[in-house]
């Protein structure tokens, strides 16, 4: 039977509960346990799919097509276990399910209330589908004291009483701020955070304390005394230079030992952390460096590109180099020459996005990369803009554009209306809702034999990648574009939807309709990112 670890946060938001959960999951996994990580999000949206990147950050897409919180990306990267739509739920989804049942008459006329109906729905979600796992780690989004989080805290309080004694523990992630004028770490915010947690019936078993310096023994003793936890359960979570150093740091601080002790499990062997040590050595001691320009439209919010940043880092690990990122707002190129911004970089990456703002700037970035032989990686929207650039400047289709931006006489990119998922035909219309109407999740793509991308993948002819898009390159222009050198080297198996384009006579120019960053892992870097960084490294030695 699975044991449950609930991770809560206090004092301030954005402390890194998702990263802490992922790191603990990796440590337990390194001890031979099977782990599952799940996330409860208290917001009222059904999912983050229609939320602004500036509000929410990245939308992480799973193989089964769920649009989820970016923390699920941390879970996958640290444990290697693919997440599913059953690993993330929001208040919105819970209320939708409850109200659907109420309209159907399932509650037989009962008054629907937060307790027991909402809390029971949360408990049912948390406790379902966990057979075969040793530990289930559940992160509760937000901060203790948030009004929208109260039903979730009540539900996890009840779960401890519902399950056998010793099958549930609570870990509270908190902040110890350093006050320079006083010259000390302050414990009072943590004390008040734990007081708030205890007032709703939850006594944390472990305090995970974010800090930028060692916790003195006296502060550790004070936290244990006033927060009612063992002194050994006050764990120091020091700031790290790399997120991949966190599992080793947490082990050194005793987190995994304390978790096992809380469950009365004897820690017989230390965790096998050799592979973590190996990649951290590569990160700390690179043999070179490359600079990649990310030409995007959400560059002011780095969390909007979280998986992308990590995938580039993985490419650097594979090539033993440091990857430096130069963030460029794509709108800049609509009024200025891109050369001064891009001449010094070793590679250009244009990521996914939606809407017309900044599109012309991305087209200019693709043109610069093509004309100057700079390695170019276009992802989703970045592929579409590269195709429009080729149509305008190589094929002579001056009015080439995307219908996403409005009516056009030359729709190089248009709205998909139907596609195959397995053997089933899925349909969409222009008038459909924005939420949940995209081509989402894992789909296969057939690669052309002998193409660059086929070689990058190891000479395979079919791959499976995750998608999140509503628009697609128009195959009516395929022949004209190929006549001018843009090769369609990957298509959907039925030959209807373009998946990959490339230039054969370019050092490295690949556009993909899918999101390869979502499947990259530190121990298994995605081949496209490894190859892209390798090409950037070659260029760095030429200029």
UniProtKB/Swiss-Prot annotation:
Residues where UTP binds: 13, 186-191, 222
Binding, ATP: 14-19, 71, 238-240
Binding of L-glutamine, residues: 54, 353, 381-384, 404, 470
Keywords: ATP-binding, Glutamine amidotransferase, Ligase, Magnesium, Metal-binding, Nucleotide-binding, Pyrimidine biosynthesis
GO terms of molecular function: ATP binding; CTP synthase activity; glutaminase activity; identical protein binding; metal ion binding
Activity control mechanisms: Allosterically activated by GTP, when glutamine is the substrate; GTP has no effect on the reaction when ammonia is the substrate. The allosteric effector GTP functions by stabilizing the protein conformation that binds the tetrahedral intermediate(s) formed during glutamine hydrolysis. Inhibited by the product CTP, via allosteric rather than competitive inhibition.
GO biological process, one term: 'de novo' CTP biosynthetic process
Catalysed reactions, semicolon-separated: UTP + L-glutamine + ATP + H2O = CTP + L-glutamate + ADP + phosphate + 2 H(+); L-glutamine + H2O = L-glutamate + NH4(+); UTP + NH4(+) + ATP = CTP + ADP + phosphate + 2 H(+)
Binding positions (CTP): 13, 146-148, 186-191, 222
Enzyme class: ligase
SUPFAM superfamilies in alphabetical order: Class I glutamine amidotransferase-like (SSF52317), P-loop containing nucleoside triphosphate hydrolases (SSF52540)
Domain called Glutamine amidotransferase type-1: residue spans: 291-542
EC numbers for this chain: 6.3.4.2
Coiled coil regions in record: none
Residues forming the catalytic site: 380, 515, 517
Pfam families attached to this UniProt entry: CTP_synth_N, GATase
Functional pathway: Pyrimidine metabolism; CTP biosynthesis via de novo pathway; CTP from UDP: step 2/2
Region (Amidoligase domain): 1-265
Database matches in InterPro entries: Class_I_gatase-like (IPR029062), CTP_synthase (IPR004468), CTP_synthase_N (IPR017456), GATASE (IPR017926), GATase1_CTP_Synthase (IPR033828), P-loop_NTPase (IPR027417)
Record's subunit section: Homotetramer.
Function: Catalyzes the ATP-dependent amination of UTP to CTP with either L-glutamine or ammonia as the source of nitrogen. Regulates intracellular CTP levels through interactions with the four ribonucleotide triphosphates.
Similarity comment: Belongs to the CTP synthase family.
Other observations noted: CTPSs have evolved a hybrid strategy for distinguishing between UTP and CTP. The overlapping regions of the product feedback inhibitory and substrate sites recognize a common feature in both compounds, the triphosphate moiety. To differentiate isosteric substrate and product pyrimidine rings, an additional pocket far from the expected kinase/ligase catalytic site, specifically recognizes the cytosine and ribose portions of the product inhibitor.
Protein name according to UniProt: CTP synthase
Species of the source: Rhodopseudomonas palustris (strain BisB5)
Species lineage: Bacteria, Pseudomonadati, Pseudomonadota, Alphaproteobacteria, Hyphomicrobiales
Gene assigned in the entry: pyrG
């Amino acid at each position: 039977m699975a044991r449950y670890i609930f991770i809560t946060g206090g004092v301030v938001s954005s402390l890194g509960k998702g990263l802490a959960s992922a790191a603990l999951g990796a440590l337990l996994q390194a001890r031979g346990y099977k782990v599952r990580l799940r996330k409860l999000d208290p917001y009222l949206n059904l999912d983050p799919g229609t939320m602004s990147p500036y509000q929410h950050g990245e939308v992480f897409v799973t193989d089964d097509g769920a649009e989820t919180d970016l923390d699920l990306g941390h879970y996958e990267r640290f444990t290697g276990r693919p997440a599913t739509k059953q690993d993330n739920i929001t208040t919105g989804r819970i209320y939708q399910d409850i109200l659907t049942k109420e309209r159907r008459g399932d509650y037989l006329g009962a008054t629907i209330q937060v307790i027991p109906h909402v809390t029971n729905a949360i408990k049912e979600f948390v406790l379902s589908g966990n057979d075969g796992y040793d530990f289930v780690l559940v992160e509760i989004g937000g901060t203790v004291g948030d009004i929208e989080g109260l039903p979730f805290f009540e539900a996890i309080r009840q779960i401890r009483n519902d399950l056998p004694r010793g099958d549930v523990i609570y870990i509270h992630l908190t902040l110890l701020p350093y006050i320079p004028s006083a010259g000390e770490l302050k414990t009072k915010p943590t004390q008040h955070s734990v007081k708030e947690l205890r007032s709703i019936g939850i006594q944390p078993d472990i305090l995970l304390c974010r800090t930028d310096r060692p916790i003195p023994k006296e502060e550790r003793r004070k936290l244990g005394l006033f927060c009612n936890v063992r002194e050994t359960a006050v764990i120091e979570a020091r700031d790290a230079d790399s997120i991949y150093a966190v599992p080793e740091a947490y082990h050194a601080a005793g987190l995994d030992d304390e978790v096992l002790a809380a469950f009365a499990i004897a820690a017989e062997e230390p965790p096998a952390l050799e592979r973590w040590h190996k990649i951290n050595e590569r990160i700390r001691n690179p043999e070179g460096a490359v600079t990649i320009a990310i030409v995007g439209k959400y560059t002011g919010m780095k969390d909007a590109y979280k998986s992308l940043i990590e995938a580039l880092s993985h490419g650097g690990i594979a090539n033993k180099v440091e990857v430096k990122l130069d963030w460029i707002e794509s709108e800049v190129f609509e009024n200025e020459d891109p050369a001064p911004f891009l001449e010094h970089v070793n590679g250009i990456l244009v990521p996914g996005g939606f809407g017309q703002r900044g599109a012309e700037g991305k087209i200019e970035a693709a043109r610069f990369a093509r004309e100057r032989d700079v390695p170019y990686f276009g992802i989703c929207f970045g592929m579409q803009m590269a195709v429009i650039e080729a149509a305008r400047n190589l094929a002579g289709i001056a009015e080439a554009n995307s219908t996403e931006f409005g009516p056009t006489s030359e729709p190089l990119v248009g709205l998909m209306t139907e596609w195959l998922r397995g053997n089933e035909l899925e349909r969409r219309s222009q008038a459909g809702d924005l939420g949940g109407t995209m081509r989402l999740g894992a789909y296969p793509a057939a690669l052309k034999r002998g193409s660059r991308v086929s070689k990058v993948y190891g000479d395979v002819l079919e791959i499976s990648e995750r998608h999140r898009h509503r628009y697609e390159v128009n195959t009516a222009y395929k022949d004209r574009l190929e006549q001018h050198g843009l090769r369609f080297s990957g298509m959907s198996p039925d030959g209807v939807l373009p998946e990959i384009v490339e230039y054969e006579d370019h050092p490295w120019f690949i556009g993909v309709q899918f999101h390869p960053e979502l499947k990259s892992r530190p121990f298994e870097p995605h081949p496209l990112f490894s190859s892209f960084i390798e090409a950037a490294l070659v260029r760095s030695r030429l200029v």
